[in-house]
Regions:
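Active-site ExK catalytic segment of metal-dependent nucleases
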Residues: 242
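N-terminal beta1-alpha1 cap of cysteine-dependent amidohydrolase-like domains
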Residues: 1-236, 245-283
Length: 283
């Protein structure tokens, strides 16, 4: 066809390769999940952490932690004590949930940067309800359908739907970010679009109580009805997102939340020598 094609501009990729080759820092991120024996189950999250490391001039070591092993805070200290940040990705079903809640509590009480994605955000909310609001039985209706304090509940348009896969809130949806939040700082804008895959959401019946006890609603649907993200103020990074930011991260364009999370992990590391990391009560 004798088409004239312009020369390929590889400048951006050459700069990326240069950044990767000259990384001078290293941080350790504990990935707490139920499918950790098969790392590919979290491939997008894993790659997104690496992308964020590139932009922060850091290597990222991922420590794979089976949430079923985290039976109490002493176990958390043993498994998570050398981590510079803790991430809890998405998932379904009640297996390993209590261990994830233990991990979220450990992160909150020890000021370790925490990033909760989808289920990980719901875990963050349940932990806060149990240990800050005082609802010891706080849970999700996914796990305790008849629970009295289900701070995570089935979305209204999912009521009565029995099949999971084809009926979720799927795909890209807009989100309005609350000004002055860590989330706003990471994105640099107040209006974003992110990809979703869930049936359960933050239960607005408890929203006022959470806000009174200090939890910040960092992002909502444009009409304010759906809570899309929450965070604890005054922390370098303790944030949960109902959406899946890992689906939009790229090697040459790390997702803003992953970038902010790794930056916070590096800051935490710089402020804590190995002997300063939280230890178990027995040590």
């Amino acid at each position: 066809l004798h088409l004239q094609t312009p020369p390929t501009d590889l400048t951006e990729w050459k700069e990326l390769i240069s950044r990767i080759a000259t990384r001078s820092k290293t941080c350790t991120i504990a990935l707490v999940g139920k499918y950790v024996k098969l790392h590919d189950a979290y491939l997008s999250v894993m790659e997104s952490l690496y992308h964020a490391g590139f932009e922060n001039e850091s290597k990222v070591n991922i420590k794979w932690v089976d949430s079923e092993h985290l039976v109490d805070q002493n176990c958390c200290a043993e498994e998570l004590g050398d981590a510079d940040g803790i991430i809890v990705p998405g998932g379904f079903g009640d297996r390993g949930i209590e261990g994830m809640i233990q991990a979220a509590q450990y992160a909150r009480e020890n000021h370790v940067p925490y990033f909760g994605i989808c289920l990980g955000m719901q875990i963050m909310v349940m932990e806060y309800a149990r240990n800050v609001l005082g609802y010891a039985d706080a849970n999700s209706s996914e796990f305790t359908p008849e629970g009295h304090h289900n701070v995570i509940d089935l979305m209204p348009d999912q009521q009565g739907v029995e099949t999971k896969g084809g009926t979720m809130r799927l795909g890209k949806y807009p989100c309005t970010i609350t000004p002055g939040t860590k989330m706003a700082e990471c994105y640099g804008t107040l209006n974003i679009d992110e990809r979703h895959r869930h049936r359960y959401e933050f239960n607005n019946e408890f929203r006022a109580e959470f806000e009174e006890k200090g939890l910040v609603i960092a992002g909502t649907s444009p009409d304010g009805r759906l809570v899309e993200a929450v965070e604890i103020p005054g922390r370098d990074f303790h944030l949960g997102a109902q959406f899946h930011p890992e689906f939009k991260s790229r090697p040459n364009r790390a997702h803003p939340l992953f970038k902010g999370f790794i930056a916070a992990a590096l800051k935490y590391q710089s402020e804590h020598t190995p002997t300063d990391h939280p230890m178990s009560l027995g040590e």
